[in-house]
Protein backbone atom coordinates (compact mmCIF):
# COMPACT_ATOMS: atom_id res chain seq x y z
CA UNK A 1 0.00 0.00 0.00
CA UNK A 2 1.45 3.35 -1.00
CA UNK A 3 -0.20 5.57 1.57
CA UNK A 4 0.08 5.24 5.28
CA UNK A 5 -3.36 4.40 6.67
CA UNK A 6 -4.47 6.20 9.84
CA UNK A 7 -7.60 5.40 11.80
CA UNK A 8 -8.47 8.64 13.55
CA UNK A 9 -10.37 7.25 16.50
CA UNK A 10 -10.11 6.51 20.20
CA UNK A 11 -12.77 3.78 19.86
CA UNK A 12 -11.52 0.31 20.76
CA UNK A 13 -14.40 -1.20 18.75
CA UNK A 14 -13.47 0.63 15.55
CA UNK A 15 -9.88 -0.43 16.00
CA UNK A 16 -10.90 -4.06 16.61
CA UNK A 17 -13.12 -4.11 13.51
CA UNK A 18 -10.29 -2.83 11.29
CA UNK A 19 -7.81 -5.22 12.94
CA UNK A 20 -9.91 -8.12 11.66
CA UNK A 21 -8.16 -7.44 8.35
CA UNK A 22 -4.41 -7.65 7.76
CA UNK A 23 -4.31 -4.10 6.47
CA UNK A 24 -1.51 -2.14 8.16
CA UNK A 25 -2.69 0.99 9.95
CA UNK A 26 -1.98 3.12 12.95
CA UNK A 27 -4.56 4.47 15.35
CA UNK A 28 -4.45 8.14 16.34
CA UNK A 29 -6.89 9.69 18.77
CA UNK A 30 -8.09 13.02 17.36
CA UNK A 31 -7.83 15.78 19.93
CA UNK A 32 -11.23 17.27 19.13
CA UNK A 33 -14.05 18.36 21.43
CA UNK A 34 -17.18 16.90 19.85
CA UNK A 35 -19.33 19.18 22.00
CA UNK A 36 -18.09 22.11 19.90
CA UNK A 37 -20.44 21.01 17.09
CA UNK A 38 -24.09 21.77 17.79
CA UNK A 39 -26.75 19.39 16.49
CA UNK A 40 -29.00 21.26 14.04
CA UNK A 41 -31.60 18.58 13.34
CA UNK A 42 -29.96 16.54 10.56
CA UNK A 43 -28.09 13.52 11.97
CA UNK A 44 -26.35 12.82 8.66
CA UNK A 45 -24.93 16.34 8.41
CA UNK A 46 -24.07 16.31 12.11
CA UNK A 47 -22.07 13.07 11.94
CA UNK A 48 -20.42 14.17 8.70
CA UNK A 49 -19.29 17.45 10.26
CA UNK A 50 -17.94 15.66 13.32
CA UNK A 51 -16.07 13.05 11.24
CA UNK A 52 -14.70 15.75 8.91
CA UNK A 53 -13.41 17.79 11.85
CA UNK A 54 -11.77 14.70 13.34
CA UNK A 55 -10.02 14.00 10.02
CA UNK A 56 -8.71 17.56 9.82
CA UNK A 57 -7.40 17.37 13.38
CA UNK A 58 -5.57 14.11 12.60
CA UNK A 59 -4.15 15.62 9.42
CA UNK A 60 -2.82 18.57 11.43
CA UNK A 61 -1.11 16.15 13.84
CA UNK A 62 1.55 15.33 11.24
CA UNK A 63 -0.36 13.01 8.93
CA UNK A 64 -0.88 15.33 5.97
CA UNK A 65 -0.01 12.69 3.34
CA UNK A 66 -1.70 9.76 5.05
CA UNK A 67 -5.03 8.25 4.11
CA UNK A 68 -7.11 9.15 7.16
CA UNK A 69 -10.27 7.31 8.18
CA UNK A 70 -12.59 8.92 10.71
CA UNK A 71 -16.14 8.19 11.75
CA UNK A 72 -18.88 9.45 13.97
CA UNK A 73 -21.85 7.47 15.20
CA UNK A 74 -25.09 8.59 16.83
CA UNK A 75 -28.31 6.96 17.94
CA UNK A 76 -31.45 8.78 16.76
CA UNK A 77 -34.82 8.26 18.41
CA UNK A 78 -37.85 10.43 17.61
CA UNK A 79 -35.59 13.16 16.22
CA UNK A 80 -33.37 13.26 19.31
CA UNK A 81 -29.67 12.41 19.07
CA UNK A 82 -28.08 10.18 21.70
CA UNK A 83 -24.29 10.40 21.91
CA UNK A 84 -22.19 8.80 24.64
CA UNK A 85 -23.85 9.15 28.04
CA UNK A 86 -22.30 11.59 30.48
CA UNK A 87 -22.93 9.46 33.59
CA UNK A 88 -24.30 6.09 34.65
CA UNK A 89 -27.62 7.75 35.44
CA UNK A 90 -27.69 9.29 31.96
CA UNK A 91 -26.97 5.87 30.41
CA UNK A 92 -29.80 4.29 32.40
CA UNK A 93 -32.16 7.05 31.24
CA UNK A 94 -31.12 6.53 27.60
CA UNK A 95 -31.76 2.79 27.81
CA UNK A 96 -35.09 3.37 29.58
CA UNK A 97 -36.11 5.71 26.74
CA UNK A 98 -35.05 3.24 24.02
CA UNK A 99 -36.53 0.19 25.78
CA UNK A 100 -39.25 -1.60 23.81
CA UNK A 101 -38.85 0.56 20.71
CA UNK A 102 -36.83 0.99 17.52
CA UNK A 103 -34.19 3.60 16.75
CA UNK A 104 -31.64 4.45 14.08
CA UNK A 105 -27.88 4.13 14.38
CA UNK A 106 -26.18 6.47 11.93
CA UNK A 107 -22.47 6.44 11.19
CA UNK A 108 -20.74 8.74 8.75
CA UNK A 109 -17.28 7.87 7.51
CA UNK A 110 -14.83 10.43 6.15
CA UNK A 111 -11.75 9.37 4.20
CA UNK A 112 -9.22 12.11 3.56
CA UNK A 113 -5.92 12.11 1.72
CA UNK A 114 -4.35 15.38 0.65
CA UNK A 115 -7.13 17.27 -1.17
CA UNK A 116 -9.30 14.21 -1.80
CA UNK A 117 -12.12 13.88 0.74
CA UNK A 118 -14.93 11.34 0.49
CA UNK A 119 -17.75 10.55 2.88
CA UNK A 120 -20.65 8.15 3.16
CA UNK A 121 -23.24 7.31 5.78
CA UNK A 122 -24.83 4.10 6.96
CA UNK A 123 -28.18 3.80 8.74
CA UNK A 124 -29.09 0.70 10.76
CA UNK A 125 -32.42 0.13 12.51
CA UNK A 126 -32.23 -1.45 15.96
CA UNK A 127 -35.16 -2.67 18.04
CA UNK A 128 -34.86 -3.25 21.78
CA UNK A 129 -36.77 -5.68 23.94
CA UNK A 130 -38.69 -4.28 26.88
CA UNK A 131 -35.69 -4.07 29.18
CA UNK A 132 -36.60 -5.10 32.72
CA UNK A 133 -36.13 -1.91 34.79
CA UNK A 134 -34.29 -3.78 37.54
CA UNK A 135 -31.56 -4.75 35.04
CA UNK A 136 -30.79 -1.29 33.62
CA UNK A 137 -28.07 -0.36 36.13
CA UNK A 138 -26.50 -3.82 35.92
CA UNK A 139 -26.36 -3.55 32.13
CA UNK A 140 -24.77 -0.09 32.26
CA UNK A 141 -22.08 -1.26 34.70
CA UNK A 142 -21.42 -4.51 32.81
CA UNK A 143 -20.86 -3.10 29.33
CA UNK A 144 -18.91 0.17 29.70
CA UNK A 145 -21.96 2.16 28.67
CA UNK A 146 -20.22 5.51 29.11
CA UNK A 147 -17.94 4.71 26.16
CA UNK A 148 -20.79 3.74 23.85
CA UNK A 149 -23.14 5.77 21.71
CA UNK A 150 -26.64 5.30 23.10
CA UNK A 151 -25.21 3.55 26.15
CA UNK A 152 -25.21 0.02 24.68
CA UNK A 153 -23.22 -2.44 22.60
CA UNK A 154 -24.03 -5.39 20.34
CA UNK A 155 -20.97 -7.54 20.92
CA UNK A 156 -20.44 -10.03 23.72
CA UNK A 157 -23.41 -10.09 26.10
CA UNK A 158 -24.40 -6.54 25.27
CA UNK A 159 -26.80 -7.81 22.64
CA UNK A 160 -29.05 -9.20 25.38
CA UNK A 161 -31.32 -6.16 25.03
CA UNK A 162 -31.54 -6.27 21.22
CA UNK A 163 -34.65 -7.73 19.63
CA UNK A 164 -33.82 -7.09 15.97
CA UNK A 165 -31.25 -5.44 13.72
CA UNK A 166 -32.02 -4.30 10.18
CA UNK A 167 -28.85 -3.34 8.35
CA UNK A 168 -25.14 -3.46 9.05
CA UNK A 169 -24.18 -4.75 12.50
CA UNK A 170 -20.70 -3.22 12.09
CA UNK A 171 -22.39 0.15 11.80
CA UNK A 172 -23.55 -0.22 15.41
CA UNK A 173 -19.90 -0.83 16.33
CA UNK A 174 -18.99 2.43 14.60
CA UNK A 175 -17.23 1.15 11.47
CA UNK A 176 -19.54 -0.14 8.71
CA UNK A 177 -17.23 -2.44 6.73
CA UNK A 178 -19.08 -2.50 3.39
CA UNK A 179 -19.32 1.28 3.27
CA UNK A 180 -15.69 1.64 4.36
CA UNK A 181 -14.55 -0.72 1.61
CA UNK A 182 -16.54 1.19 -1.02
CA UNK A 183 -14.76 4.40 0.00
CA UNK A 184 -11.34 2.73 0.22
CA UNK A 185 -11.76 1.45 -3.34
CA UNK A 186 -11.87 5.09 -4.47
CA UNK A 187 -8.29 5.25 -3.13
CA UNK A 188 -7.37 1.98 -4.92
CA UNK A 189 -7.47 -0.09 -1.73
CA UNK A 190 -9.76 -3.07 -1.17
CA UNK A 191 -10.32 -4.85 2.12
CA UNK A 192 -10.72 -8.03 0.07
CA UNK A 193 -6.94 -7.95 -0.40
CA UNK A 194 -6.41 -7.99 3.37
CA UNK A 195 -8.56 -10.88 4.52
CA UNK A 196 -6.91 -12.89 7.29
From Swiss-Prot:
It is found in: Cytoplasm. It comes from the Bacteria. Transmembrane segments: none annotated. It is an enzyme of class 3 (hydrolase). Its cofactor is a divalent metal cation. InterPro entries: ITPase-like_fam (IPR029001), Maf-like (IPR003697). It catalyses: dTTP + H2O = dTMP + diphosphate + H(+); UTP + H2O = UMP + diphosphate + H(+). One of its GO terms (cellular component) is cytoplasm. Keywords: Cytoplasm, Hydrolase, Nucleotide metabolism. GO terms for molecular function: dTTP diphosphatase activity; nucleoside triphosphate diphosphatase activity; UTP diphosphatase activity. The record marks 13, 73, 155 as: Important for substrate specificity. The active site is at residue 72. Its EC number is 3.6.1.9. GO terms for biological process: nucleotide metabolic process. Nucleoside triphosphate pyrophosphatase that hydrolyzes dTTP and UTP. May have a dual role in cell division arrest and in preventing the incorporation of modified nucleotides into cellular nucleic acids. HAMAP family: Maf. Belongs to the Maf family. YhdE subfamily. This is dTTP/UTP pyrophosphatase.
